[in-house]
């Protein structure tokens, strides 16, 4: 009886376990697609440097359904500025499934995440087949075709200007006050 329960538990655990798709989140050298570098630059054109800038991988079944996966990671410093440390990210999609992915980066001083930041940038959306499927699980997929990109600021805030009527009323008021003296 104990053997039967143990076998049933193993079968249920095996059925319940679903392989998750995996991606190598990297934009430099051997860890990036085809050994190419995809440096991320700031608004000034300088490579992003240090924890003041963050990057995160966005994945979805289609380009219109991209959602953040994994944790935001800071950019490296010094000669490696503009690049993130390579890591494996597990997605919410099944291994072996087709997916759309993009790398997004932002200035952490302008917002806590990509959506909140006013200085931010995104790579082009890439189509990949996720790793992690099969038995044994396939190796994580590289970001084949990832190209470098730059951050863009929101620009100066729009300052509303007074309407013509308001300017006319202010001018008339000034003339009225001047005339009273």
Predicted segments, located by residue:
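Mature extracellular "passenger" or substrate-interacting domains of secreted, surface-exposed proteins
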Residues: 21-158
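Short, charged juxtamembrane terminal tails flanking transmembrane helices
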Residues: 179-181
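Short, threonine-centered small-residue motifs that mark membrane-proximal processing/anchoring sites
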Residues: 2-21, 150-177
